[in-house]
Amino acid sequence: MSTMTPAEIVSELDKHIIGQAKAKKAVAVALRNRWRRQQVAEPLRQEITPKNILMIGPTGVGKTEIARRLAKLADAPFIKIEATKFTEVGYVGRDVDSIVRDLIEISVKQTRETEMRKVRSKATDLAEDRILDVLLPQPRAVGFGASAEHANDDNNATRQTFRKRLREGQLDDKEIELDIEQPAVGMDIMAPPGMEEMTEQIRSMFSNLGSGKKQRRKVKIKEALKLLTDEEAAKMLNDEEVKTKAVQNVEQNGIVFLDEIDKITSRNHEGGGGEVSRQGVQRDLLPLVEGTTINTKYGMVKTDHILFIASGAFHLAKPSDLIPELQGRFPIRVELDSLSVKDFEAILVATDASLVKQYQALLATEDVKLEFADDGIRRLAEIAYAVNEKTENIGARRLYTVIEKLLEEVSFAAGNHAGQSVTIDSAYVDHALGEVSKDEDLSRYVL
């Protein structure tokens, strides 16, 4: 669990997301409240439930990115799902309980990786021993006394020399034959939507088929070390303990990001099949959000303390179009701002992994130095903003399209520019994008 203060969380989010201070503050406080709740004594701790968040704002302004980065900071099980994928129980499609089942799968994988990292060092030593046993088989004991001891000392010295060479990577390309444990047979079962529970049960019946069997393989030492380290680490783990920790992690720290929640609102009051289905999904979501117990293959999972972050553009609907019970379960509402030209400029250069840095790094692999002048950045931001205004507003995602079109020729002919420097200024931007951005019909298809 993260022990960062809200200010530290916002500072970390600022490295990746431009603007949206209100949304960042809301999620930072929600995450800090997780830690605060853990410090409260029982039985009051059980009564403190997370305050779910509803983010309202157009596409491409950072709603999903804020939730994704937050989960990374919290090191928490996180799942992003589109509300439109789910249907009311009885209709063809996925039911909302599968959200928790998917989340617990993510948590088990995350917990297993964490536990394996803890024993990685010991597992690596054991894997090295197994490789050295193949490279240097133990000599058969011949005689007793001083001569046997001397032979043993020589063998140990040789073994240490080989271990040193193994760790330095000098033996990486040498091939050896090993008995490697076969993974359990995975079964892919195609089933109708809504029958995930049944397929899970069938899959678990066959999950142990083939496990424990060993296969003799010829592999390079570098690959053998990785395979054997994973095998030794897996032996050290207690599967039941991993499952228990994973369930606890979901119950206490899980984050569910419900995207496109505005698409399941009732847009008129005349009813109709579609409206019934949309309202049905909301009613199915309600117990999940307010706290229920879901049966999974890892045991019962309570959703009382899972944090739900919902988001939607709400162009054709309003938050008040959600059923009243669901509205009440999202007490914190945050409106995200549309992006300005200045925001676009900052997105291009100011974040830790900005688009400009990404393209500079990509072209540097072919010895092409890409430089962006300030006026070039400004012009690029202006064009992206103008195209958004004239056509469909897709927010910061427009920058991907614009910069790809801008660098199309340079990327294509990068091999011919090796050792050269390419400067992107406003003149270069206008030459590459000017005609396309001015012609509304053309920009609708190209940008």
From Swiss-Prot:
Keywords, alphabetical: ATP-binding, Chaperone, Cytoplasm, Nucleotide-binding, Stress response
Binding annotation for ATP: I18, G60, V61, G62, K63, T64, E65, D259, E325, R397
Compartment(s): Cytoplasm
Entry keyword annotation includes Nucleotide-binding: yes
Cysteine disulfide partners in this protein: none
Signal peptide coordinates: none
InterPro entries hit by this protein: AAA+_ATPase (IPR003593), ATP-dep_Clp_protease_ClpX (IPR050052), ATPase_AAA_core (IPR003959), Clp_ATPase_C (IPR019489), HslU (IPR004491), P-loop_NTPase (IPR027417)
Keyword Chaperone included in the entry's annotation: yes
CDD domains: RecA-like_HslU
Cross-referenced SUPFAM superfamilies: P-loop containing nucleoside triphosphate hydrolases (SSF52540)
Chief place where the protein resides: cytoplasm
CC annotations in GO: HslUV protease complex
BP GO terms, sorted: protein unfolding; proteolysis involved in protein catabolic process
Entry GO MF terms: ATP binding; ATP hydrolysis activity; peptidase activity; proteasome-activating activity
Family assignment from sequence similarity: Belongs to the ClpX chaperone family. HslU subfamily.
Assembly notes: A double ring-shaped homohexamer of HslV is capped on each side by a ring-shaped HslU homohexamer. The assembly of the HslU/HslV complex is dependent on binding of ATP.
Primary role: ATPase subunit of a proteasome-like degradation complex; this subunit has chaperone activity. The binding of ATP and its subsequent hydrolysis by HslU are essential for unfolding of protein substrates subsequently hydrolyzed by HslV. HslU recognizes the N-terminal part of its protein substrates and unfolds these before they are guided to HslV for hydrolysis.
Full protein name: ATP-dependent protease ATPase subunit HslU
